[in-house]
A protein has these predicted regions:
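Regulatory N- and C-terminal appendages and interdomain linkers associated
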Residues: 1-41
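Short secondary-structure transition/capping segments
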Residues: 32-33, 161-163
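Conserved ATP-binding subdomain of kinase catalytic cores across diverse folds
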Residues: 42-162
C-alpha cells in the first residue's frame, strides 16, 4: 500500500493510508483529521461558494476547509475565512478525478515543478483531493490574495474552456 500523501510504501502502522510523519507535515497534527461531507451538503455548499464569487464554477466542486483541534481530535470544518485547505471530492461525471489531479501534481513534483502541498484523503468511502491553500496570506486583521496559475492558464486557455 502507498501513502496517500507522499506516495511511498506504508506499513500497517499507517493511519488511514497516511504515514504519521506525513500527517504531521501536512496538517501539523499527530492524528489524521476527521472529515465527513455527504454529496447533498457538498452540492449546496459548492453552489453557495460559486454564487458568492469565492471560486470559479466548474465540473470539480471545491470546498474551503479549516483545521480545528478539539480534545486532541483534529477535524476539517467548512468555513468561509480564514481557510487553510481546499477539498475537491469525487464528482459523478468523471470517475477518479481527485486521483487524477493528485497524480498530475505528483508528476509535477517529480519533474521539479513547484506545487502546493497536496494529497488524497478518505471521504465517504471515496477519495477526495486535498491541498493546502497557498494563495492567501492571513494576519490578525486581514487576508491578502496572491496570484496563482493552474495548468489551464499555462496552456493559455480561458477558464470557461477548462473542461
Amino acid at each position: 500500500m502507498k501513502c496517500l500523501c507522499c506516495g511511498k510504501d506504508i506499513d500497517k502502522n499507517g493511519e488511514n493510508g497516511w504515514h504519521k510523519s506525513c500527517i504531521k507535515r501536512f496538517f501539523g497534527a499527530s492524528k489524521l483529521p476527521e472529515i465527513e461531507i455527504d454529496d447533498e451538503t457538498l452540492k449546496k455548499l459548492a453552489d453557495e461558494t460559486v454564487n458568492n464569487g469565492l471560486t470559479v464554477p466548474g465540473v470539480q466542486k471545491k470546498l474551503s476547509l479549516h483545521l480545528i483541534s478539539e480534545n486532541k481530535s483534529p477535524k476539517l470544518t467548512i468555513v468561509n475565512f480564514p481557510t487553510g485547505y481546499i477539498l475537491k471530492p469525487q464528482v459523478p461525471q468523471y470517475e477518479t478525478l481527485p486521483e487524477a489531479e493528485h497524480l498530475v501534481m505528483s508528476m509535477a513534483d517529480i519533474t521539479g515543478i513547484s506545487t502546493v502541498p497536496h494529497a488524497l484523503i478518505g471521504n465517504n468511502g471515496n477519495y477526495a483531493y486535498i491541498t493546502k491553500r497557498a494563495d492567501r496570506i492571513t494576519n490578525t486583521d486581514r487576508t491578502a490574495m496572491l496570484a496563482m496559475e493552474d495548468f489551464c492558464q499555462l496552456d493559455l486557455r480561458l477558464t470557461q474552456d477548462k473542461y
